[in-house]
Amino acid sequence: GGVVKEAEDVIATLEVRKEAQKYPAELIPVRLSEIYLINEGYEWVVSTVKQELKKDFQGIEEDLEKLQQVIDSGKIGSKKKEEWLAIGITVCAILANEVDGMEWKTLIDGNRETPVLQYKDRTIDPMKLVWSKVKAGEPCNVIEEYKKCLD
């Protein structure tokens, strides 16, 4: 035990979040649950590329071409949100492997708690990289999206 007064002062500053109130999005250090999502999504892409193209996937920039071939084959239905999210996560994983300073974070915005990449003052959301486009009926080019993240 330390000083009770100090603990009471800290506790007095805490605020219980209200149901109907909107809070600003927060970026916190990546948590284990998001690391699990990153690994699960990446492993799904590795096995899908191996299954569909009979090629290895190493998580490097050159692998984006293989990922695009799987997308272009039409094997992933436009309603398969989790699979598209896995592709977005994999593009981010390649960015994290290839670019110094890219760092995984957990985004908490009231609607979801999800892994995102932070680079300098930018946040790269794997869901917005591909799923948002697919959902809107737009074509998905992972090589272009990857290059946009480098600008």
How would you describe each model-predicted region?
Residues 1, 50, 83, 141-142, ...:
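Acidic, serine/threonine-rich, charge-biased low-complexity segments
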Residues 8-11, 114-151:
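A recognition module on extended beta-rich or small alphabeta surfaces enriched in W/G with H and D/E
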Residues 16-81:
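N-terminal low-complexity, intrinsically disordered segments
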Residues 73-120:
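Amphipathic, interaction-prone secondary-structure segments
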Residues 59-63, 108, 145-146:
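Short coil/turn segments at secondary-structure boundaries
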Residues 2, 55, 101-102:
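Short, well-ordered coil loops that connect the C-terminus of an alpha-helix to the N-terminus
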